[in-house]
Amino acid sequence: MKTKQVFGLKIQPPKKSAFMIETPENLPKLHMLLLASGKRGGGKSVAVSNLVRMYLEQGILDRVMLISPTYWSNKEIFEPLNIDEDDIIEPSKDAVKTVVEKVEADKAEWDDFQVRIKKWKDFQKLMKSDKPMWSINPELLLEYMDMGFLDNAERPVWKYAQERLPRIFLIIDDSMGTDLMNPKSGLTNLCIKHRHIAEGTGISIAMLVQSYSAQQGIARPIRENCTFLCLFKNNSEQQIKKIYEEVGDKLTEEQFAKMFEYATNEPYSFMCIDFAPKKPEYKFRKRFEEYLITPSVADT
């Protein structure tokens, strides 16, 4: 086959990454769409809660929301995440709308804060100038007074620990079979567009389910947009085969099955598949702390 290069038609990818939040080397990228699949009592809630806790301890997240009908039964699991009671949401048909409205409200507050900071800096500059007070526009002084600058000259304080666009993580737990899973609830749309809501503020999502692809499992569009998958012990060969067909990468079915068996051979253990790994060898893990190096990666 002969080829001929055409000058000036090379595609230039955008500089902006799909994952805009910096994370430590061994923590997955954000914003993520995480799916955790495993039987009831298998450890999904504990695993996801621990991952979110790690992000919080690194100062990466500002707020955690939870959609679940069983929070009070599982309070001990989620307590380290310091979830505000107003951010614990029942899995109703309006739950997604509630989440989006909360993210949009945070974005609006951030925008207002940015304006307030600019005006505060202008006020400080004005106060340090030699301009006589009587010569300042009265309407401007009234605006500064309404903002409290005349009574308190200290710099305005943002409501979260770090001044930045709010970083929010949503956990969806024990919600299969509820109104949240109704096609009209907007859940699928949220999972597809999660990085773009509230004018690009975005949100990370962890969705915990008992079945990956069965009738009561995860909708295919959500599976196809997953960035991080946690698979717990599963004795169904049909389910494992289905998962392999969708996410098996360059592994043979036998290699995938052996890797899955190794990753899940301890109580509450699970296999992770990162679809946006920072390095090729970071794609597969046993739990979060052990990388599983595939033959194709090891040989490179």
Predicted regions: what is each one?
Residues 32, 63, 168, 268-269:
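A generic secondary-structure signal marking the coil-to-beta-strand transition
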Residues 216-300:
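Conserved GTP-binding G-domain of TRAFAC-class P-loop NTPases and closely related GTPase folds
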Residues 60, 201, 268:
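Residue-level signal for beta-strand positions within conserved beta-sheet cores that form or flank
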Residues 20-24, 31-54, 69-73, 124-254:
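Conserved P-loop NTPase motor cores
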Residues 1-11, 37-44, 113:
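Phospho-regulatory, low-complexity terminal regions
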Residues 65, 204-206, 271:
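A structural signal for isolated positions on well-ordered beta-strands in alpha/beta enzyme cores
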Residues 1-23, 71:
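N-terminal pre-Walker A segment at the start of P-loop NTPase domains
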Residues 41-130:
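Conserved P-loop
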